[in-house]
């Protein structure tokens, strides 16, 4: 039996409705929150920025860009972030990848002002997530779990296998899963016999950045598979999971149209948190 396809569209519609309810309750003197995107000269980043702009326009949220070039060094990057941190009209800041060559991810984590960190990259936000008290969680992994919640797929008590350990998806995803009472295994490029572990998963999350890495024989019958991968092959978007996995899994996110749109909607939710319009414990809207 073919897997149930976990489309991101109804999840986005539900999140948009939640966001519009929150915005409708804000005080009369409060304007809409404003996101500033640090935009490199990179086609993938620019495509993502357009997707953000499209959703934010639909939601009547303010959106700005600051173009950054590859020659920007750490000192000038620090000046830019300091200026945005002091700008009262800026609610949140998002630094799109790739970063300038002179700016490391560690530098970004150190320099990003935590109170305007819309994607949970700062040391403070990462630390809060690590101790199980997140305020702003990275939008991609959080979006994946909100998607599961939307479709009524339980996380607690299940074995979740995560392929990928990046600081923006795999690692924070593992911490979020632990906070939701899953039993978590993390796999990466040095993991021996990857398929042996993936076949043990009730929930398989794939964020490896390798097109069609996961084949049907790597998935347990009835498993739920969440694909965070996005690559371009022959002019079309493909994920880290071979579409043939749909013949084995019970549920599977598509690429495109799965986790990607949900990620963007979660950025909007995070912006509302930074604006003080959502409670700290409202990490999973609608969750018990």
From Swiss-Prot:
This is Bifunctional protein FolD. HAMAP family: THF_DHG_CYH. Homodimer. It comes from Thermomicrobium roseum (strain ATCC 27502 / DSM 5159 / P-2). Belongs to the tetrahydrofolate dehydrogenase/cyclohydrolase family. NADP(+) binds at residues 164-166, 230. One of its GO terms (cellular component) is cytosol. Pathway: One-carbon metabolism; tetrahydrofolate interconversion. The gene is folD.
